[in-house]
Regions:
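Short acidic-glycine-tyrosine-enriched beta hairpin
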Residues: 1-3
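Glycine/small-residue-rich hydrophobic helix-like segments
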Residues: 228, 232-237, 241-265
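Winged helix-turn-helix DNA-binding recognition segment
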Residues: 127-131
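Preference for long, well-ordered alpha-helical segments
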Residues: 147, 249, 264-275
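Short, structured motif recognition centered on aromatic/hydrophobic residues
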Residues: 97-106, 133-136, 231-241, 270-274
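Double-stranded beta-helix
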Residues: 7-47
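Acidic, glycine/proline-rich low-complexity segments that act as flexible tails and inter-domain linkers
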Residues: 48-97, 109, 116-124, 148-229, ...
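Substrate/cofactor-recognition hotspot
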Residues: 134, 140-146
Length: 275
């Protein structure tokens, strides 16, 4: 088609150079370019689709263990058979929800390499760039910028590599003036009426933390468009479960999930897919 530019050529283990082919509105021309690096080639290969490979209907390519076929073939067979056959066929969680949960869990456990493998598959299966960014942004409130930043920069590279322009459309719904009020209302909606004015409670020396919870975590993030309340609570549930050491917080958010419609069976299906 007109105005399309792409490149093609030999595999990365070949000495052949790749070609960039430009197709202007009128006519066509070829431009000889230098070899494509392994990194560029890998980015292209990461645009994956579900494949009926090795009898595993849920398998993607590459997988989180791609690259180990020569050194650890038995492990690869065990892992792929379990993850892409046994696990994906357990329960009836839709693919979009499954991949959103997996991305959140990989953030929680700091699996950045695996995140980079799974993100293109998630995009291919219908998870939108906006949803990806909202998962990443919300993770900051629970995991901290030190843990989220590498995921965010890698996600930006993947999104741009697939042709998505950045920044994406703004999703904020609050202002500096109303973020506390709306954040506290989000707490009430999720956890119950006892959260009304919770940011005013607690010892004076640490009360500011309750305020930050209301205005930043809930006012800045939970009120954003792009994910609904049920999706956001599922994300938080996955962040906390994968991070570990957050038992009380995990129990609290499990209750919040159930309160807004993510019932016990749904949470079991979600956590099963994150295993």
């Amino acid at each position: 088609p007109a105005n399309v530019k792409h490149w093609h050529g030999a595999a990365r283990d070949s000495w052949f150079a790749h070609l960039a082919i430009e197709v202007p509105a009128q006519g066509a021309s070829n431009e000889c370019c230098g070899p494509v690096s392994d990194e560029e080639y890998g980015m292209c290969k990461s645009r994956v689709e579900p494949a009926m490979e090795s009898g595993h209907p849920g398998k993607i390519s590459p997988t989180p263990v791609s690259g180990l076929e020569q050194s650890d073939p038995e492990f690869v067979q065990i892992f792929e058979s379990f993850a892409f056959d046994e696990v994906v066929n357990q329960g009836d969680l839709d693919e979009r929800t499954r991949f959103m949960a997996i991305l959140a869990a990989l953030l929680g456990c700091q699996g950045v390499d695996e995140f980079n493998v799974m993100l293109p598959a998630a995009l291919n299966l219908g998870v939108t760039p906006v949803e990806v960014k909202e998962i990443l942004y919300q993770a900051t409130a629970y995991l901290g910028i030190g843990r989220v930043y590498p995921f965010l920069t890698d996600a930006n590279e993947i999104l741009e590599g697939q042709g998505y322009g950045l920044p994406l459309k703004a999703m904020a719904t609050t202002t500096k003036e109303d973020r506390l009020e709306k954040g506290n209302q989000a707490q009430v909606d999720l956890f119950g009426p006892h959260m009304k004015g919770f940011y005013l409670s607690g010892p004076e020396e640490s009360r500011h933390i309750n305020k930050w919870l209301a205005d930043n975590c809930f006012g800045d993030y939970y009120t954003r468009r792009g994910l609904d309340d049920r999706q956001r609570e599922m994300m938080t549930f996955c962040f906390l479960a994968a991070q570990g050491g957050c038992g009380p917080q995990l129990a609290s958010h499990a209750a919040a999930n159930i309160r807004i419609g993510n019932d016990r069976q749904f949470l079991i299906r979600v956590i099963s897919q994150c295993l």
